[in-house]
């Protein structure tokens, strides 16, 4: 089942007042899920939407964002198992819009919002202030499963490190990218 944001909610030059999906779409999902428990939701949206309020009605959720002209065949390949999904979230999905630090300064004055979060934008805010989130920055699943062992990190310079690990694919699925490493440079804010 495809769900997403209507064109009126996707724009430059104004901010959305909510991260919620349209109520009519949630009602449709609930009606379909009441008849068939094997519902997979494919999201089509240009910005974050909350999924916690309705995720219980879906066996799976695939965020496709706003696909381009070749998006349909690529999405079909993922849905039918020809390729394994490998995308990672480029942002954090909070449980509620009020969990996001940008709401402190919103709606601003006369259409202008003061971006006062400083370096505490996105995951930095949630990590620093130990805020629970629905899906963290970098989250992503695959049809493949892995076993990771012998993880080692060695500082090699002021701002460099060497990281190694043994990653074993424990499934019959070949993923495009088996492993990702993210590190944080500790610095004063």
Predicted regions and their residues:
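Active/binding-pocket-proximal capping segment
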Residues: 9, 18, 180-188
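Glycine/threonine-rich flexible loop motifs
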Residues: 5-22
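A short helix->loop->beta-strand "cap" motif at the edges of active sites that frequently abuts
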Residues: 34-39, 58-59
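Secreted, periplasmic, or luminal enzymes acting at the cell surface/secretory milieu
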Residues: 44-176, 180-184
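A cross-domain feature marking catalytic cores of carbohydrate-active enzymes
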Residues: 3, 43
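Redox-cofactor binding/interface segments in oxidoreductases and associated redox assembly factors
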Residues: 1-2, 63
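Short, glycine/acidic-rich beta->alpha junctions
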Residues: 20-24, 70-71
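Alpha-helical scaffolding segments of alpha/beta enzyme cores, especially the outer helices
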Residues: 24-34
């Amino acid at each position: 089942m495809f769900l997403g944001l209507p064109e009126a909610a996707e724009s430059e030059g104004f901010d959305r007042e909510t991260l919620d999906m349209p109520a009519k779409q949630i009602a449709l999902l609930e009606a379909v899920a009441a008849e068939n428990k094997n519902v997979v939701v494919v999201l089509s949206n240009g910005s974050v939407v909350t999924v916690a309020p309705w995720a219980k009605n879906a066996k799976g959720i695939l965020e496709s964002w706003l696909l381009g002209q070749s998006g349909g065949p690529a999405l079909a390949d993922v849905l039918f198992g020809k390729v394994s999904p490998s995308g990672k979230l480029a942002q954090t999905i909070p449980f509620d819009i009020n969990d996001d630090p940008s709401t402190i300064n919103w709606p601003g004055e006369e259409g202008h919002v003061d971006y006062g979060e400083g370096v505490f934008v996105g995951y930095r805010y949630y990590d620093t202030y130990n805020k629970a989130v629905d899906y963290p920055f970098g989250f992503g699943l695959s049809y493949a499963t892995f076993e990771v062992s012998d993880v080692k990190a060695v500082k090699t310079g002021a701002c460099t490190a060497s990281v190694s690990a043994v990653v074993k694919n424990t499934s019959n699925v070949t993923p495009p990218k088996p492993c990702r490493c993210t590190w944080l440079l500790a610095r004063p804010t």
